[in-house]
Amino acid sequence: MKRIVNFIWILLCTVVVHASGSGDGRQVENFDFGWRFSLDPHLNERKAMKQSFDDEGWKYLNLPHDWAVEGYFSEKYPSGPGGGALPGGVGWYRKHFKIDKKDAGKRIYIHFDGAYMNTSVYFNGKKIGWRPYGYIPFEYELTSLVNFDGDNVILVKVDNSDQPNSRWYSGCGIYRNVYLIKTGGVHVVTDGTYIKTTSLTDKAAELEVVTTLCNKTGKQETVEVKSILKDRDGNVVDEAESRPIIAPTTDSNTDIVHTLDVANPHLWNLDDTYMYTLFTEIKIDGFLVDSYETPYGIRNIKFTADKGFFLNGKNMKINGVCLHHDLGCLGAAINNVALHRQLKMLKDMGCNGIRCTHNPPAPELLNMCDTMGFVVMDEAFDMWRRRKTANDYARFFDKWHEVDLKDMVRRDRNHPCIVMWSIGNEVLEQWNSANADTLSLAMANLVLNFGHNEKQEIESGKKNMNTLLTEHLIKIVKDLDQTRPVTAGCNEPSPANNLFKAEGLDIIGYNYHNKNIPDVPKNFPGKPFIITESVSALATRGYYRMPSDSMFIWPKRWDIPFEDATFSCSSYDNCHVPWGSTHEETLDVVKNNDFVAGQFLWTGFDYIGEPTPFGWPARSSFFGVVDLAGFPKDAYYLYQSEWSDKPVLHLFPHWTWDEGDEIDMWCYYNNADEVELFVNGESRGVRKKTEHCYHAVWNKVFYRPGSVKVVARKNGAIVGTKEIFTAGKPRSIRLTADKTVQKADRRDLTYITVEILDQQGHLCPDATDLVRFVISQGNAKIIGVDNGSPISSERFKIDCRRAFYGKCLVVVQNNGDAGKIKLTASSGVLTPASVEIDVIR
């Protein structure tokens, strides 16, 4: 119950992390509702920015919004299957709003958590800003242009027409939250509070608080700055106060430093995510002009070369996954409920780490990792100067990388969940080439301002421009945060890698290359090591290719086109890419090498785009241990059996085949010494896991209709059984809602699992029936359907879905009205089913 309370508390703080308070203090208003939208590459922006422009014909919607996921799949889109085979384009968002005259003395800002990409913002007829990077927050001041008590119009142009620009599905639009901020003339700048633990023992902690203020009053002001630290129960732990004289802000802001003491600190850890809250108050002449809240967890992290990762002095493995930002059938549009569903499934699997691949995440993800107990690798870029796709961020890197990297670190550095920064993923600057890009003159002056000795090192081959660029990025991070190590995801394991030669890269990070891992202590003496990206096994939920001890390495090479008539990958953990491994192989490497701090498995969930090893009609990935709809694949239970203490007894595959088939039966289990298989009551033998094998297997089990059962024993006593029955023909539909109560907020969701059953109530594992959905009662909408198939061309935003290996999914959202929602599912002659949801205020 404590964990749930923590989670709810931190979600409330997501609105006030930037600040709290109303009236005389800061006001932060959610600005997501009541927008109009048009997808039009030919719109005249000079006309659209005018207040008199007629937008009545535009679509009415609320943010966050991803227009691409609403479209049809097509191989003709320039994004290609790698980008999800969904449309790009130019989208326009427009909103009318009023600001009261009582706010005339305040500073007014508009804050975007993220929009993909090339976002231009216009306010009351004037362009006020442009931001190219699609994953970074940005903010503009509106004050001088506001019509107080009159009509105000904001217009946002999001241009994702230059495709391809991403190796995976990016989404399109204002896909993260937007806020309107009102504060005093002297105020804390956005992300302007930095807390760091300067000393920590069992009995005491010392915190340094740096508060960055700006003064936009136009005159010198004497201000009272107060920092108040409170515990979870609201008790004051310590406070500090100062009265600086703040000059009007021109080019620089003013930093105020306070020291706070915490007696007997309650430490943040993965099982007890205790958070303090720092309250910052700014007063002038006794009047509150700004207030600001910052949640903070006190903890100690350490990485060592011989033992890996320590949290609060406890050695532990980082059992992590890589996670892209899309939410399946919801696309890239952030939703707290959908994101929490993903993280809860991973937590239940035993996962304790998230790598944000390969970009700054939504702030909601970090808030949830703080409260749910994950450690995080926060990553800035997928490319630097050398591009990976025709129109990616490389074209903006020279001008924008420093701004974007600083904004990421400033925003995220107070999160206890973050234990390392990553400055890049598989950047091409790891290697030299005769055709290597040269730095711009401005960048050369910035990065290559070296003395005689460094120049000699370059000439002798010890350093080069890419090495110095790496050091430049590291310095940007460490100038803003000295409490966490810096790493990068590298797919070149050689010490000659330009990034590894750089000074200041604290942790060696390999993407894959298991065979090179034993040499890490020799090649990088004294350096901690982590597998920043691992495995890349391939699987289609419900599909099995035998014999299971055969290995399918697909494709033969990443740049060679590959085809297989099934467009499916075996779920036996016997299919992986040539640069990757099986799940069990990497589990074994991490488990049996103390110096390996852990791994980030590629990936936790399937994601839209990058459908390796296939091309069209495949349009989403095969890498996840959970499919795109949120249904676990078999490998999920392998990790749960190794990473968690939850009892696991998972037998697969199903038991509905052609008579006479010979089937390989696998079992993942824990908390048992042995497992025994029975077919129609007859034993097929006892099996045990071995030192380097993490499953039990019975090869070529002769199939006969009936049932297959596994019995687990510990010390001779039965501790678990699992039985699978042969399924008959489809007869009915079963609906299972993940919750039957929603909050009437127009955001809450219910995920409903749809299963096709036979007459006895057994899942039909090969069923492909088309299921239709209707809201038969209540004010709600279907906001997504899916079935986990990476090759389905069915749209996500319709009211029907074909079952895939017996299952599909429908997601229901309320429209803000309290009452009862009823969803009914039907399919031809199958017995229909309904589920009811109560919507409460």
Regions found by a protein language model. Name each.
Residues 147, 212-304, 698, 704-705, ...:
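Extended acidic/polar, glycine-enriched regions
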Residues 60-66, 70-73, 177, 287-690, ...:
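Extended substrate-binding grooves/exosites of carbohydrate-active enzymes
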Residues 33, 38-40, 83, 88-191, ...:
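Accessory beta-strand-rich segments of carbohydrate-active enzymes
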Residues 303, 644-664, 670-672, 725-751, ...:
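Short S/T/G/P-enriched beta-strand
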Residues 20-111, 166, 171-174, 605, ...:
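Extended carbohydrate-recognition surfaces in non-catalytic/accessory domains of CAZymes
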Residues 142-144, 257-267, 697-703, 797-816:
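Short, hydrophobic beta-strand segments
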Residues 209-213, 279-281, 665-669, 711, ...:
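Beta-strand-rich structural segments
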Residues 52, 221-226, 239, 270-276, ...:
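Short flexible loop/turn segments that cap and initiate beta-strands
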